[in-house]
Amino acid sequence: MNSPNQNPRPIVIALGGNALLQRGQPPEVEIQKANIHIAALAIAKVARHYPVVVTHGNGPQVGLLALQGECEKSCKPYPLDVLGAETEGMIGYLLEQELRNQLPGRDVVTLLTQIVVDRQDPAFLQPTKPIGPVYTLEQAQQLAQERGWAIAADGQDYRRVVASPEPQRIIELPTIQLLVNSGALVVCAGGGGIPVVVNEAGGLQGVEAVIDKDLAAALLAENLQAQGLLLLTDIDGVYENWGTNYAHRFEQTTPKNLRRYRFATGSIGPKVEAACRFVETTGQWCGIGKLDQALDIIDGKAGTVVMP
C-alpha cells in the first residue's frame, strides 16, 4: 500500500452502523455522540497520514425516524428517502463536529448525497435491508401484521427489512471530488446515500428504499479513484466457518478466493461483496476489520486485506 506522499488519492472509510449505535443500545443522542467520539478518534488517526473520505451507516436511525413518524397521526409518515436525508444530516453533523475537534485547522465538510438507482431493480420486490431496532419473533410478526412490514432474521433477533437497490451513479460526485482536491475531509453518501431515480422528464425523484452503505462506499471509492477502501465494523475481519470451532480469519486474500464462500447476507456478506467489486474494478486494496485497528489494517497488520 502506498504512503500518502506517493499517492495523494483518498482512502474511503465506511463506518458500520455499530460504530454509531451498538446492538441493544437505546438510540439516544448522548449515546450516539459517545460512540461517534470513539469513531472520530480512529478516523483522525488515519486522516493525519492520508486524505480521507468518510461514509457511514444509518440503519438504526432511519428505522427510529420511521417509527416516530408512524406515531404522529396528524400527517402521513415521511418516505424513506426523506428519512435517509434527515439521518445523513444528523449523523454527518455529529461526525463533522467530532472530526473538527480531533483535527483542528482541518476543513471537514458534510455533503448530502443523492445516488441514482434503477426503478426496475428487482430489490424493490424483495426487501432485504434491515432497519430500525431489533425485535423478538413474536414482536416482529405482530408489527408485520399491523403495519404491513417485511421482516427477516438478523442474528438471533428480527428486524424490519426494506428494499435495497443497487447504487448506479452518484449525483454529487463532481462536488465531492472538488472538496477532496481542496484538502477537505468529506463526510458523504451516509446511509448509502439518498436513493433517487430519473423520472420521465429527466429530473430526479426520491424512492422508498435504503441503499447498502458498503456497496455505495465501493462505488464512491471507485469513482474517486481511491487508493483504498476501508470497511470498519465490530469484528476483526472476514472469517471462514464463522461461529464454529474451526473459524479462521482471512488475513490477506483475493476476490476470487472470497467468492468461493458464502457469507451471511445481513452482516459480513455485503462487505465482502463491496470489497470484491472494488478490488476487481480498480486493482486497489480493500481492508475489512475493527474500527480501532484502522491504521493497522492499512499497514496489513490486522483485519482482512483483499488484494487483486
Where is each model-derived feature located?
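C-terminal catalytic "cap/lid" subdomain
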Residues: 2-308
